[in-house]
Amino acid sequence: MSSMDQVIKKENKGRTSTVGKYSVLIMIVGIVFIAANLRAPLTSVGPMVGFIKDDINISNTMAGMITTLPLLSFALFSPIVPKLGQKYGVELIILGSIVFLTVGIAIRSLSGVASLYIGTAILGLAISVGNVLLPGLIKREFPKRIGLMTGVYSISMNLFGAIASGVSVPIALGWRFGWKGALGIWGVLSFISIFFWLLQMKHSNVRRDTVHKEKADSHVNLWSSALAWQVTLFMGLQSMFFYVLVAWLPEILKQQGLNSSQSGLMLSVMLLALLPFTFIVPVIAGRMSGQRSLVTITAILFLIGTFGLLYGSSNLIIFWIIALGIGGGFAFSLSMMFFGLRTRNAQQAAELSGMAQSVGYLLAAIGPTLFGFIHD
């Protein structure tokens, strides 16, 4: 029996007779499609930075803001998202977010500097909803399979993120869509995802008594919790590191002699290298009483990749890129796992997710713009 079959069988126990294996499968498919939209609209930007700068005549600092704006949106909106999910329902808020994501991607692809930044801000707000609510949704729907389901949605998120960075240049140049088409094409994915999420909502089996009980039991001041701040700091550091790489790795590699297609491909290699670990690490972490050893491995991988890329042999670029990718897989997976492992219920998981992503992405937002300023 496959891992996914085990999830469906295990989580199907205890559900009403009208909701069975099909409803669990639809929930999994819905989560996979939502997760697929959480990185692709962002990772597609990195290989296009040079084209955008040349087309609309902006500085490196302003180009860095294209990546920074979504992070600021994450930081500002994340604390509000759990409250919206609690008041109106997680599924409905996620539906609204994917609609706004489609609109934001479309606006970003229009002509002009203003539309570029307005659309980017809108899609950032939309993505923050999925970022915050998915960990809590997984804890609610799959409490006995948090590690496995975290791996499933992490794989989807990072796979499509890798694809987006790798195909941006071919779409822009090979298909002659330009940078606007290369960024705008991801609106098709978000539009399709709306229908899959609607199908999931139709078969949703949310028990209101359980939801109300969680509301009553989840009044914990996370902002005064040392553990919550540890999770937040870890989230912020890994996010800052990741988004600096997404925004500027292609430009760094071009300065080392790679062309646009090759540098975009290297970004894809990094994102693909982390894929298996975004699945493996949550499963392993979920079976461990503590995760400090995994955090240590993460730090070592980041150090090897960073110093190798900056000071190591250019002949070993692929090795440094893979080390960074594996480290990113460890870091991201652990961040998402901590939201579920360090809380009692789905609402607390959403609130910790909101706190960590708010403060964490505020730290992360400094990275791309600061790097662009130094680069100028």
Walk through the language-model features, giving the residues of each:
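Juxtamembrane intracellular "pre-TM" segments in multi-pass secondary transporters
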Residues: K9-K21, K202-V231
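A late C-terminal transmembrane helix in Major Facilitator Superfamily
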Residues: T343-D376
